[in-house]
């Protein structure tokens, strides 16, 4: 073979090789990212909706855009119960829900519906992020779920359309929407309310049509869900502290590579801090907003809170067996230690 021809052949082969390498690089770049469906019931502009968007951003960043979270807020994928079932079946990947519907699967989660469990957010954080909180999360895999961590739903407060509630007796006869679990039902029935379990996604319409008189939720939820439009009375009762459980589908999570699992776990941890801070600021902002929109605000006095505690004491004692005596006493002891009592 002549030298000139040989050079042409070498150049041609080199070009083909480079072209092949280029094609491989393009192919790698063009691989579709893993899409992760994340459904939730709250509004997208709520503090927790914003935290969900933050989670999506962190996942994209940590995975170098190889994992993409697609959020579906405002109950677009259904109520909490449906979201939980979608994770169990494998048709969804990520969600956050209140502990109340989880208690239908794992009764011990009902401990968070007991009244006046935590004095403040600091105590709640210590218990949830400590051994007692982990014990509960460790029960989830057996049900097809992974508990990544706890976010904050917050202290719940009562609104209604009938009259001011500032005393225990004022609760009597109020048709009050409660979360769908036995603990919430038992507590509010014990306080004299006509407690009606109902999915959150149906709540605004029920309030608007007077199917129910009132409801109980954290302040930022009351604002962002626009309950104040049909609920002129607010009571700062802080009667229950409710966490959100940040959940993943176990079937899906188990199929991830270790690197992908690390991304989800780290993004959940980062977003927990973001969410709690946003939620707490959101509650402060919400109270100011609600007052500016002519919502009449009342509070229980120390004496009235003590009456409520006394009223529900036998109910709580009776619920210990249903929830799990060991869980209730463990959480109460952890809360007492965290509060320095």
Which residues make up each language-model segment?
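Bacterial N-terminal signal peptides that target proteins for export
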Residues: 2-13
């Amino acid at each position: 073979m002549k030298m000139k021809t040989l050079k042409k052949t070498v150049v041609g082969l080199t070009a083909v090789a480079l072209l092949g390498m280029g094609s491989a690089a393009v192919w790698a770049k063009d691989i579709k990212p893993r899409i992760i469906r994340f459904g939730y019931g709250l509004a997208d502009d709520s503090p927790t909706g914003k935290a969900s968007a933050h989670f999506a951003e962190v996942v994209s960043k940590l995975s170098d855009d190889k994992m993409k979270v697609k959020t579906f807020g405002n109950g677009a994928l259904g109520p909490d119960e449906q979201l939980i079932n979608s994770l169990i079946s494998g048709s969804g990947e990520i969600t956050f829900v209140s502990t109340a519907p989880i208690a239908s699967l794992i009764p011990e989660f009902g401990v968070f519906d007991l009244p006046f469990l935590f004095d403040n957010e600091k105590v709640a954080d210590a218990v949830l992020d400590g051994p007692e909180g982990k014990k509960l999360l460790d029960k989830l895999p057996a049900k097809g779920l992974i508990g990544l961590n706890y976010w904050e739903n917050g202290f719940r407060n009562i609104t209604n359309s009938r009259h001011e509630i500032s005393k225990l007796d004022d609760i009597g006869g109020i048709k009050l929407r409660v979360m769908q679990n036995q603990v919430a039902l038992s507590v509010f029935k014990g306080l004299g309310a006509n407690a009606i379990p109902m999915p959150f996604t149906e709540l605004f319409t029920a309030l608007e049509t007077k199917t129910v008189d009132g409801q109980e939720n954290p302040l930022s939820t009351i604002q962002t869900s626009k309950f104040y439009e049909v609920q002129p009375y607010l009571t700062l009762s802080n009667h229950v502290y409710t966490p959100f459980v940040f959940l993943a589908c176990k079937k899906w999570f188990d199929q991830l590579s270790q690197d992908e699992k690390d991304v989800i776990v780290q993004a959940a941890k980062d977003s927990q801090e973001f969410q709690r801070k946003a939620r707490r600021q959101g509650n402060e902002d919400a109270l100011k907003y609600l007052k500016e929109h002519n919502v009449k605000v009342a509070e229980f006095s120390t004496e009235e809170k003590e009456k409520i505690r006394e009223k529900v004491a036998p109910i709580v004692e009776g619920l210990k067996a249903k929830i799990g005596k060991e869980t209730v006493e463990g959480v109460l002891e952890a809360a007492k230690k965290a509060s320095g009592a």
